[in-house]
Amino acid sequence: MKKPHVQQKTERRISAALRLVLVAVLLLAQIALVLVLNDLLRQRMAIAYTLLELVALAYVFRINSRPGGSSYKLGWTLLILTVPVVGLILYWLWNGDHPQKRLDLKKLPRPQESEARREASRLQVEKLRREHPEWGRLAAYLDRQGFPLYTGTGAVYLPTGEAYLEDMLERMEQAEHFIFMEFYIMAEGQLWDQLMDIFRRKAGQGVEIKVLFDDFGSMMRMPEEAVEELRRIGAEVLIFNPVHHYVNRLYFNYRDHRKIACIDGDTAYTGGANIADEYANITERFGYWKDDGIRLEGQACWTLTREFIYMWERMGGSLQQEHDYYRPQSTAAGQGFVQPIADGPDSNPVSSAEDAFLQLIGGAKHMVYITSPYLAIDESMEKALCMAAGSGVDVRLMMPGIPDHKFAFMVAESYFGELLNHGVKIYRFTPGLLHGKTVLADREAAFVGSVNMDYRSFQLHFECGTLLYGAPAMETLLEDMDGIMEKSRQVTRADWEHRPLLHRVLGGLLRPFAMWM
């Protein structure tokens, strides 16, 4: 006899919870084993222990001489200097010098662009450079990183998670050839049930369906039974970087934090929202969940489709057709320029997303508005914000009124004092969690995507997003940001100075270790 649907979901949640407990126990066991090994070496093998201390000291110099952010260097330096052997072993296990070795990703080239496409992008860059030299420089830089600049693309900014996800599902209903999805979190719930209904119908019509999600992000939310159901209806599923396969993966860095949906090559989505009920405010978590996203139609969709294909094939997946089959088949009407980008730890020390943020902030002459749920930035980003505000640019940072990670928000607060001193205006979204990740500069250039203003997004996770230059969607983004500030409380210097003592103490103590939060 078939079990009731509610009972099945309850059993799945229990199974997922047990898996998380197992991973937590293994992680604690790993740390305990390192501590025991440290104690044994210190007591019984003094010479070996001393040699490891010297090696640890050498690693401190090595870490600080390599390219990378100061926050990353400071965190590891403090840990290794405080407990040299423990810190050294954890560095070997959890970080290493080559993040790509922590991932089972094949070394493959990205799907290649034709010379005609590369030349078209260069011509568009020159056109943008003539109209807006500062944004032309940014577009040229990203073009050299392999992210072409496009016209012939429509862009629609979707100002809430509800609008974003509803629009996405409506377009999936119209799919005729393929649906590709890559998300950090996929979770059972009402939204998932709607998506599964679409998948069943489309799989029955012969539509190619591929789903890729991050194991850590979805661990408690997407049980194995749901994955098997996906496969039974004909969808292909890959799970990014399973945390339980190897001891050195019992960690939450090097995750796939992207949000990508590609439909028939001509439509693509990215933004801040994942596939879970709270993002559409079907269920309430942390008050009102304010998210956003963007829909692209036309030529620029190829970059997001290409990045999905690249990740899929590096994880060992295969396609039913050649790469060119998945390219856009139409050109959409749209003003301005569109430039989707992607980023990941395997490209370090180059960070396309962080560099784009720095140039958006540094290139602005009048205003820079930013939304982000987190703030854990390097000295270069903090300096860019302070210099922009100090030179008369209207810099505004919008953050949650109800944060989802309290310790992470204490770290964010630790930056407020310096930013306020230089004239940065900070707003906290009173109704709840502001989860969107956007930047708007001078109403001329903007970013919408998955990238938080923190070290993990800039250096440790796989991310994506879209740059807009002179596109009408930026006016919708500006209206949304104005609406956010109307519902927000501006943080004053007095507010910051009188924050709870626990926030002041923990914010300062945890700040060097933000890469682990």
Where are the language model's segments positioned?
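Short, glycine-rich nucleotide/cofactor-binding loops
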Residues: 185-190, 370-378
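Helical hairpin unit composed of two closely spaced alpha helices linked by a short loop
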Residues: 359, 364, 374-395, 400, ...
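C-terminal structural cap/anchor segments
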Residues: 393-397, 401-453
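Glycine- and other small-residue-rich loops at beta-strand/loop junctions that grip anionic moieties
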Residues: 184, 249, 373-374, 408
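N-terminal localization/anchoring segments of enzymes in phospholipid and broader phosphate metabolism
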Residues: 1-355, 359, 363, 403, ...
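A general structural signal for well-ordered alpha-helical packing
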Residues: 354, 382, 412-416
